Every structure is written in structure tokens, then in C-alpha cells.
């Protein structure tokens, strides 16, 4: 929804109604509560949810004040929308198929940093399913060996001596 003025505080009811109508037509309005068409003060038809807890006056007042109901969106609808797709991140409910790249040498464009080249889609892309919730941040104190950023096995020193020895 676009606004014509930057200092305009709220959206017009027409634009909000067309947005809600678009959501309903797209089939993503996932509330199980029966809906009823009512008229606001301006005579514009809006959708009001009827529940046993709230009277009709409260629901129509909320809509006229600009409160929006919570909308649950389908994952397939997000995949169809171009603005939600990213070359680096894929939203998925499944676990990742492969681990993320460990170092920059896997990227073909990083090998020659001195020349400026245009990016092409033919290069190896790391778009895939990466987990963003499985990492754990804590100090590891019982490691004796590790893998450095170049992939070489190294020994972890328990104590570092500085100065003349």
C-alpha cells in the first residue's frame, strides 16, 4: 500500500478495505470465526468478526480505528511472491540438506579479488536450506584440536606464553 504523503499518519479506509479484500480473495484469511458485512460511518462495507465475547459495537469500532486482525500466511504463498524470495535465504520447514559453506574458498568469485568482474549466475551459488536456529553460543574449554578457516587440522593451545622463554 503506497501513501502519497510522507507525513500522512494513517492509511485511508479505502486502501485498508481493498487490502483486506485482496487477502480474502487470496484465501489467506484463516480465521474460523463467522464473518458478517457491516457498514462503517462513511458507508463503506467492511468485514466484522462476530464472537461471543465481543459485541458488534466493539468490533466495528476497532475496524474504524485501524486495528487489523492477525492474518496467518501460507508458506506456498510466500514462495510465489517475488519480493519474499532471496538468493541467499530459503524459508523452509525442513531441516537443511547440507551444511553451510565453511570458508570463502568455495565461492568462485572470491578467488580473484583484484579484478572487478560482473556477477554472473553461472557461478556456484550457495542458495539452499540452512538452519538458523541450531547454533549454540558457549565457550568450549575441553578441545585439543580444531579445524581452522582454511580447513587444516590444528592443535588448540591450553595456555599461551608470551615474552622470552
Swiss-Prot record:
Residues 1-3 form the signal peptide. Seems to promote the survival of visceral and proprioceptive sensory neurons. One of its GO terms (biological process) is modulation of chemical synaptic transmission. GO terms for cellular component: axon; dendrite; extracellular space; synaptic vesicle. Gene3D superfamilies: Cystine-knot cytokines. Residues 4-119 form a propeptide. It comes from Anilius scytale. It comes from the Eukaryota. InterPro entries: Cystine-knot_cytokine, Nerve_growth_factor-like, Nerve_growth_factor-rel, Neurotrophin-3, NTF3_N. Pfam families: NGF, NTF3_N. This is Neurotrophin-3. It is found in: Secreted. One of its GO terms (molecular function) is nerve growth factor receptor binding. PANTHER family: NERVE GROWTH FACTOR NGF -RELATED, NEUROTROPHIN-3. Keywords: Cleavage on pair of basic residues, Glycoprotein, Growth factor, Secreted, Signal. The keyword Iron does not apply. Belongs to the NGF-beta family. Glycans are attached at residue 112.
Amino acid at each position: 500500500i503506497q501513501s502519497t504523503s510522507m507525513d500522512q499518519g494513517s492509511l485511508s479506509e479505502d486502501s485498508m478495505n481493498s487490502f483486506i479484500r485482496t487477502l480474502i480473495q487470496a484465501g489467506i484469511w484463516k480465521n474460523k470465526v463467522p464473518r458478517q458485512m457491516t457498514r462503517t460511518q462513511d458507508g463503506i462495507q467492511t468485514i466484522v468478526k462476530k464472537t461471543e465475547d465481543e459485541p458488534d459495537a466493539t468490533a466495528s469500532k476497532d475496524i474504524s480505528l485501524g486495528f487489523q486482525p492477525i492474518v496467518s500466511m501460507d508458506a506456498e504463498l510466500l514462495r510465489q511472491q517475488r519480493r519474499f524470495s532471496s538468493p541467499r535465504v530459503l524459508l523452509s520447514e525442513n531441516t537443511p540438506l547440507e551444511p553451510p559453506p565453511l570458508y570463502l574458498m568455495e565461492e568462485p568469485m572470491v578467488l580473484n579479488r583484484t579484478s572487478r568482474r560482473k556477477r554472473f549466475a553461472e557461478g556456484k551459488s550457495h542458495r539452499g536450506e540452512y538452519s538458523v536456529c541450531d547454533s549454540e553460543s558457549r565457550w568450549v574449554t575441553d578441545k585439543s584440536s580444531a579445524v581452522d578457516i582454511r580447513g587444516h587440522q590444528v592443535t588448540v593451545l591450553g595456555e599461551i606464553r608470551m615474552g622470552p622463554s
